[in-house]
Amino acid sequence: MAGVNDAIRDSVLFTTADSIISWSRRSALWPETFGIACCAIEMISAGCARYDLDRFGVVFRPSPRQSDVMIIAGTVTRKFAPVVRRLYDQMPEPRWVIAMGTCAISGGVYNTYAVVQGSETFVPVDVHVPGCPPRPEALMHGFLLLQEKIKKSRALTGTPLGRVIAS
């Protein structure tokens, strides 16, 4: 009888629905492909063969309705902020935001009336990737931190976690 119990133990997986849902969400992150400033060049580099974000399950999508991650890569002006918010609202739930670069995080060197001083004023930001511009490795690290955040969140209860800063 011990052989039957060993066979069952080796073929049955015990887990929770939360862990299955968070595994599927973090394994297939689809960021939206739009860039605002020079950080977008580094974002494009991160998707190329040298860095290959596809191996982490990150596949860039052309439409907000097909994506679940928004990368705000660059300076956001007050005139452009409602457009970014509309794109965010068009994304299906659950959705996450990565603020990439100093300009997206705090307005950067542009301390003027026309530039939004931080993306958190119009969308909730989950991960901050600092730098001017941040290297593709920093964006990769930001995606790994986002995956860890998704792993720790409760999918069924919708418990959100705080923001994460990539170093």
Swiss-Prot record:
Q: Which domain of life is it from?
A: Bacteria
Q: GO terms for biological process?
A: aerobic respiration; electron transport coupled proton transport
Localization terms from the record: Cell inner membrane
Q: How does it sit in the membrane?
A: Peripheral membrane protein
Q: Any binding details for the cofactor?
A: Binds 1 [4Fe-4S] cluster.
**GO CC list:** plasma membrane; respiratory chain complex I
Say if the entry is tagged with keyword Transcription regulation.
Answer: no
Molecular function (Gene Ontology), one example: 4 iron, 4 sulfur cluster binding
Q: What does this protein do?
A: NDH-1 shuttles electrons from NADH, via FMN and iron-sulfur (Fe-S) centers, to quinones in the respiratory chain. The immediate electron acceptor for the enzyme in this species is believed to be ubiquinone. Couples the redox reaction to proton translocation (for every two electrons transferred, four hydrogen ions are translocated across the cytoplasmic membrane), and thus conserves the redox energy in a proton gradient.
What is this protein's name?
A: NADH-quinone oxidoreductase subunit B 2
Organism annotation: Rhizobium meliloti (strain 1021) (Ensifer meliloti)
